[in-house]
């Protein structure tokens, strides 16, 4: 019975570690091999490229290194092509990292002082893109604001992302799960030999 509990615990820790990697951050949701950005009720395919080091490889919420990044948003809804789109990247200073939401951004008094990239509002038919040179690794927050011209409505997407992400913070969970599973198997084999 104890062995079954140990195995279950090891499996749970392992699954939680994997699930944490696949969770969407903020308005961004990984869906298969693409990322879907939700701007209010509107959706867009969102991808980031690091052309200098990774060529045409696409990234969603984590960029493996600080370098030139090209952010590309392809509209799923035609109405986005008619809206004024503003794009801002800020340093994540709330301490919430991947859990930063729009309400956290609204509490920041001086957004300009932590802005690292800004694309002023303008209409971009079909595809929106912005290029930014990241100098430092760390957590950042993308803020996309879409405004209708006729109805004066505003929709916002907030998505935290990490630059210089290597996946190292999940290894302790994986190592612990493997050690726990190994211990359970060792204990099981010793018990069977003595029986």
PLM feature spans:
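Bacterial N-terminal signal peptides that target proteins for export
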Residues: 1-10
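Contiguous segments within soluble domain cores/interaction surfaces
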Residues: 25-129, 135-137, 145-195
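Hydrophobic helical h-region of N-terminal Sec-dependent signal peptides
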Residues: 11-15
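N-terminal signal peptide c-region/cleavage motif recognized by signal peptidases
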Residues: 19-21
């Amino acid at each position: 019975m104890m062995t079954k509990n140990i195995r279950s615990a090891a499996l749970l820790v392992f699954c939680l570690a994997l699930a944490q990697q696949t969770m969407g951050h903020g308005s961004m949701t990984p869906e298969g091999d693409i990322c879907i950005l939700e701007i209010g009720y509107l959706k867009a395919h969102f991808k980031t490229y690091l052309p200098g080091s990774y060529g045409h490889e696409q990234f969603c919420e984590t960029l493996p290194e600080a370098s030139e990044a090209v952010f590309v948003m392809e509209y799923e809804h035609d109405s986005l092509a008619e809206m004024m789109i503003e794009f801002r990247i800020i340093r994540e200073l709330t301490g919430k990292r991947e859990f930063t939401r729009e309400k956290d951004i609204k509490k920041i008094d001086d957004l300009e002082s932590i802005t690292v990239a800004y694309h002023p509002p303008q209409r971009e038919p079909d595809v929106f893109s912005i290029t930014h040179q990241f100098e430092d690794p760390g957590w950042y927050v993308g803020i996309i604001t879409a405004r209708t011209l006729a109805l004066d409505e505003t929709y916002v997407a907030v998505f935290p992302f990490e630059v210089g992400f290597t996946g190292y913070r999940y290894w302790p969970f994986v190592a612990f799960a493997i050690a726990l599973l190994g211990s359970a198997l060792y204990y099981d084999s010793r018990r069977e030999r003595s029986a």
